[in-house]
Amino acid sequence: VHAGWRGLAGQGVSQGRAQGQGVLEALCAAWPAAQHPSQRAAIQVWLGPCIGPQRFEVGPEVRQAFILHDPAAVACFVPLPGLPALGERVAAAAPKYLADLPALARQRLAALGFERVAGNDGSADWCTASQPSRFFSHRRDGARLGSSGRMAACIACQA
């Protein structure tokens, strides 16, 4: 399953899902092996690379989308200090935050009963924005390279 913040948070009502019901909730409803919470503890989940918590700058609407679903999500957002330069006027701009997308995914997975989560731990090694030699980033490379980024994943069932 691939999801950005909107898919993870369940932003917007689509495909019969209610607000706050994202792709993980939809997967649990549609995938027979994950339909019962008791089955989810045995499923191994792997989080792939994404923009990291030191680079993912978001507005209050993103923070609110997660907090409405789970108030504990507030821990995954760090306010960005917006200090103006000396003598500069302060604009009435909305606050900005650094969001920890891997931690938000792990919270969502834990709430659904998934206990075995590997892969992206939110460290800089997994950040697509700060690792240009390892990962394509549409945010970083889109204007220069177009939207032709590639990602491959292999998923296997183990008996």
Give each language-model segment a name.
Residues 1-159:
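Active-site microenvironment for binding and transforming phosphate-containing groups
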